[in-house]
Amino acid sequence: MEKLLERVNHILEALPYITKYSGKTVVIKYGGAAMAKADLKESFAKDIVLLKYVGIHPVIVHGGGPEINRLLDSLKIPTEFIHGHRVTDTQTMEVVEMVLTGKVNKQIVSMINSQGGKAVGISGKDGNLAKAVKAPIEIELEGKEKQLFDVGLVGRIESINPEILHNLQKEGFIPVISPVAESVEGDSLNINADTFAGEIAGALEAEKLILLTDTEGILIDGKLATGLSRGKMKEYIRKGEISGGMIPKVECCLAAIDQGVNRTHIIDGRVSHSILIEIFTNQGIGSLIES
């Protein structure tokens, strides 16, 4: 009986959050270990379906780097790197789009639908969802100032037209978006999935943006930091306390906040049901950044 009461208490703990977020949009960037391990994939799909059943509108933007690497290797397509960043030429971009939109996207859709959801897979090209421009990347070389490097068909979002997402949500569907967009010249461009998720969240005026990562969250002096303001994050970056791959994730969160997203979260996707823990428990998980 005690165990049953404990389960009931867990459900009751979620009630105020269900009330608060019902009818709201939550954008989730799906990537890392959560996409690789079978048990985590299943828990992710169940989390998404449960969100929909309690009236929350999840929108998913996904990555897929490891799958791209595997197919490029199997096809023996040579890859050029500039300071660790892949150069995406036309042949590589064909593989990127095929893997992200044709394979990974449909696997996620199938996974969610198998748990009782109604997911629909699209890319940034569908319904003119996203327009992008080819953009160089900024790299800070040791002992030198930041420099710009051309890495091929890699883009930056110029505009989002969320009409297709609104229509899908209105009909009860869960949008699953691959991070490929089209330039005004008609070229397919690979977009950073974190950045794309942030832009989608801003355009939808989402209540939350959640980034699933392979870390606990933002670590400052080895300790998990949360309840962080925009100003504090800028200070941490300036002082070098946030560095490497975490910087673009934080900048993505800050950009989303600037566009009106209320709360952004960087959470540990290696933890089963981390999305539900974040949204429906008092303690939450990972790092919260808010305006």
UniProtKB/Swiss-Prot annotation:
Pfam families: AA_kinase
Amino-acid positions noted as binding substrate in the UniProt annotation, renumbered to this chain: 64-65, 86, 190
Broad enzyme group: transferase
GO biological process: arginine biosynthetic process via ornithine; L-arginine biosynthetic process
UniProt keyword Amino-acid biosynthesis, yes or no: yes
UniProt KW keywords: Amino-acid biosynthesis, Arginine biosynthesis, ATP-binding, Cytoplasm, Kinase, Nucleotide-binding, Transferase
Chief location of this protein within or outside the cell: cytoplasm
Keyword Metal-binding: no
Localization of this protein: Cytoplasm
InterPro entries membership: AceGlu_kinase-like_sf (IPR036393), AcgluKinase_fam (IPR004662), ArgB (IPR037528), Asp/Glu/Uridylate_kinase (IPR001048), NAGK-C (IPR041727)
E.C. designation(s): 2.7.2.8
One Gene Ontology MF term: ATP binding
Site (Transition state stabilizer): 29, 249
Physiological role: Catalyzes the ATP-dependent phosphorylation of N-acetyl-L-glutamate.
Family indicated by similarity: Belongs to the acetylglutamate kinase family. ArgB subfamily.
Protein known as: Acetylglutamate kinase
